[in-house]
Each structure stands twice: as structure tokens, then as C-alpha cells.
A protein has these predicted regions:
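Structured catalytic cores of large enzymes
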Residues: 1-57, 62-65, 77-80, 98-181
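Short, charged/polar "capping" segments at the starts of alpha-helices
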Residues: 66-71
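Short helix-loop-beta junction
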Residues: 74-87
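Short beta->alpha junction loops
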Residues: 89-98
Length: 181
């Protein structure tokens, strides 16, 4: 069977270059027919002459407590050494510990940063305190799920990876983070 796809309008591109991620390419190669038809992207542009104000591949959102901020910076340093552009923001930077503030911050990052996050890490257990927890949206009035934050365009599918390290204090943070650093 031969199938011909014709594009009309648009920019003759397969999506925006800034929304492509080297971390997703392996999955795309396995899941997309004719993956080789996609233009090859040189991801080195992300590492050249960019400051963190231009975005990051790995965004860490942390409560304002100093134990959490210190551990978030340790994780970011580890990821940066791995070649993953990482940035830490606190809940105060985001606009508060509310689903509205977090979702708006993440949506803005994805839609407007030169380098949109491919992954977001929420550091802290579910809760309302700005010093040691991060709130999660309640899906359909019964289920807390961070996946709602990852759905930027409203199609109920994630545009980025969301993860959470649950911890309530410095001791729990040390245990969790020591598992991968």
C-alpha cells in the first residue's frame, strides 16, 4: 500500500525545531513510520551561548525551604554534568504553591522559552506548605495527578515528562536523591 501525505499551509516543517528533544528522538524512531523523513536536528545549538534565561531541558520545581533548594541545586548540578541543561526554580519563583501558578509557569516555559523543558521534576511530597511540599491537581474531583501539568495544549496527552520525588524533610530527601546521584 502506498500512502501519499500532502501538506498545505504551515511552514513545511514537522513541528517546531524548539519542541524537538534529543531525549524523545529514540522513542520517536521506534514509534513513527518513516522516522528518517524527519529532518535531522543538531541539538548542540542548545549548549552554545545560552544562559539559563533561555530555558532548559530539565526543570526542577522545588519548595522554598533551604533543604529542598540545596538538594534541587545538587540534582541540577548532577544533570548539568551529564550534559542535560537543568534549572531550579522555587515555588515563589513560580508564583506560589497552587495548581494555577505551577501550570501557568510550566505552560509558559513550554510555549515561550527558547529551550522548552523536556522533563520537569517536582521536588517534595503533595501538600500546601510552600516550604516543604508541592500541590498536585485533582483530576475529575477524585484523583491527584501531576500529569495534568504536562498537558500543555489541552489534548489530555503530555507534552513533557513529569516526575516527583516525594519527601517531607531533609532526611527523606537525602534517601531519595542518593538513589541516583
Amino acid at each position: 500500500i502506498d500512502v501519499e501525505v500532502v501538506f498545505e499551509g504551515g511552514s513545511d516543517e514537522f513541528g517546531e525545531k524548539r519542541n524537538r528533544s534529543r531525549w524523545w528522538d529514540c522513542s520517536l524512531a521506534d514509534a513513527v513510520m518513516n522516522y528518517d523523513a524527519l529532518p535531522v536536528i543538531d541539538y548542540n545549538w542548545m549548549h552554545q551561548d545560552h544562559e539559563f534565561t533561555d530555558g532548559c531541558e530539565y526543570l526542577i520545581i522545588t519548595p522554598d525551604g533551604s533543604d529542598f533548594v540545596d538538594k534541587a541545586n545538587e540534582i541540577a548540578e548532577f544533570r548539568n554534568k551529564q550534559g542535560i541543561l537543568s534549572q531550579v526554580v522555587t515555588l515563589s519563583d513560580v508564583g506560589g504553591n497552587s495548581t494555577y501558578a505551577i501550570e501557568n509557569y510550566v505552560n509558559d516555559a513550554y510555549n515561550n522559552w527558547a529551550i522548552p523543558p523536556a522533563a520537569v521534576l517536582l521536588l517534595g511530597d503533595f501538600g500546601y506548605s510552600i516550604t516543604n511540599s508541592v500541590i498536585a491537581p485533582i483530576y475529575d474531583n477524585y484523583c491527584a495527578s501531576d500529569n495534568i501539568y504536562a498537558d500543555v495544549d489541552g489534548d489530555h496527552l503530555p507534552e513533557m515528562i513529569f516526575a516527583r520525588i516525594t519527601a517531607n524533610d531533609a532526611d527523606q530527601l537525602d534517601v531519595m536523591v542518593s538513589k541516583f546521584i
